[in-house]
Amino acid sequence: MNYYYGDKFSAVALSLKNGSRMWFILPDEGYTTADVLADGQYMQMVLQQDWENTKWMKVNLSVPKFDANSTINLKDGLQEMGVTDVFNELTSNFNEITGDVPIYLTAANQSVRVQIDEEGVKAAAYIEFPGATSPAPPEEIIDFILDRPFIFAITTDSIPLFMGTVNTP
């Protein structure tokens, strides 16, 4: 399993069945998840696969069961980017889809749910189970115990699909 060490945190990447990865990012003692998130180094690790600070090793991973969900209002952000007509009763135009039925949007929300338990990782509408890859024998064994607040991310091709924090493991 990949083990990454940064200035304020360490992390492991768990390979999922479809080639995605689930990252667990644990702040070092004396640092908080907010410290790690503010620094941004973790994002470089997730996006660029910073192999310089990565080791292949056997990891005894202990992850608590958790269920994280969030709903984000996208309407304000879309309007700030200039997407306004669809929210206006007089200017919206969905005729290609609805024919002559006039409709407009009153809201735009994104809901996300990530669950992890003994059976695997469930995110949004799909289920993934841990898979195994083994490029080389591990150098050493490390215990990686998520027993204090941590950050998680699910990525595909180094693109974050889901990210969140668990504050009470």
Where is each model-derived feature located?
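Mature hydrolase/peptidase catalytic cores and their serpin-fold inhibitory cores, especially
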Residues: 1-169
